[in-house]
Amino acid sequence: TRVWNIADSKLWYLTRDQAQGFLDLEKSPEYQEDVIKKEIDLVVMHISEILRKVGKKPINIIDLGCGDGKKAVIFIQYLKGKVRLRYCPIDISGYMVEKALDKIKRMNVGEVVEFQWNISDFENLENVSKVLRSGSFKNNLFLLLGNTLGNFETHELLYNVRNSMGDGDIILIGNGLNNHKVEDDIVRSCRENPLRDEFFSLILQLAGFKKNQIQYGVRFRNDRLETFYTILSDISLSFQDRTIEFYKGDQIVVAFAYHYEKSEFMSYLKMYFGNVQLHVLEDSSYTLALCKK
């Protein structure tokens, strides 16, 4: 079997339809159960400790992979009236950034930063944090929630984030873990969620495939959840003066999400941050990591 790997989250949001498709997926009962509810439960359980770490000084909240801003809302609600804050959403999708800016502005809790770096990948983070660290806003709280870290090559993203942080800056990371029940729980849930197929198939449809030429699949291997499509018949796709031949049975990997074992995840975080605390759900399926540089 030939396997083509085009798993790059930049391809998820090339159009507004794709971005909205992801927001629709997030609302599905399966996604709510697998990611959002788990993360919110951990945040609520440990919010006092997180706020203690954040302190009372004015703070920039830098929301990495902001989506429509809802992941940041819970923190901003708790911080409201306690500290001066500025909110800065970062996302590759301009559509997502618009939604996040609008949502947080309506909360009326502090300054919302709109500048050229809002729509950006995570390679430009150093520019972001330097610009924001001005006046009385010397401290940054980075949010990397909703399994966003898992959708990237772990060390590359952690390296970029750490390089953009100043001494004393904090990052909060929400990510799934491998509790040796991923196959029964997450894989099955993802396979049975039609909105996942609807969302990820858009990538291949933009490339020229028809929906009836591909078959959705999910598997867990090498510490990561892979979403892939199997080609159902021979097909050639042409663009400009180039043609690519795909054969029946070929597989195209369109997305991955790393789920490490707790000890392995901890060891990776300790490579980049001096102070790391892991808060883990009782079933060891999800963690909230509070890290300080």
Which residue stretches match the model-derived regions?
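Conserved S-adenosyl-L-methionine
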Residues: G274-D283
